[in-house]
């Protein structure tokens, strides 16, 4: 009798893993591409609470990687030159966001990490783990 709850929990876990990985199967077959103005706004809006004087910020945009899904979640790394909520981080701040892509377009963004100063290397390392490089932003 005790095996049934464990089996049910294991089966539920396996099924949830299958459904969450389905989005990764609709991967784009095209090359990397530049973000549209609307996509840039989506990402910039998600960074608003992490920077001061956003109207003065200068965004450096990296291309969207070729392996980004047509529908699903992807990671994106780039950088912003702005004042931070934490003054030691003022200046160039690499960031990592998770974006939701629908029909090949970024429709939402959530900040995973942003840091400037000597801690910028932490974000660069996080990006590198996912095959991304915020230093490719222009």
Show which residues each predicted segment covers:
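Cystatin/cathelin-like cysteine-protease inhibitor module
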Residues: 19-138
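Sec-dependent bacterial lipoprotein signal peptides
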Residues: 1-18
């Amino acid at each position: 009798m005790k095996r049934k709850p464990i089996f049910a929990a294991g089966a539920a876990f396996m099924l949830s893993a299958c459904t969450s990985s389905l989005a990764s199967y609709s991967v784009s077959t095209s090359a990397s591409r530049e973000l549209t103005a609307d996509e840039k706004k989506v990402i910039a809006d998600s960074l608003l609470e992490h920077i001061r004087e956003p109207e003065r910020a200068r965004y450096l945009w990296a291309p969207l990687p070729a392996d980004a899904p047509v529908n699903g979640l992807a990671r994106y790394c780039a950088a912003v030159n702005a004042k931070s909520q934490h003054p030691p981080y003022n200046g160039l701040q690499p960031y990592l966001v998770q974006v939701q892509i629908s029909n090949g377009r970024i429709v939402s963004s959530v900040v995973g990490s942003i840091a400037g100063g000597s801690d910028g290397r932490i974000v660069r390392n996080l990006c590198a783990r996912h095959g991304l490089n915020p230093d490719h932003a222009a």
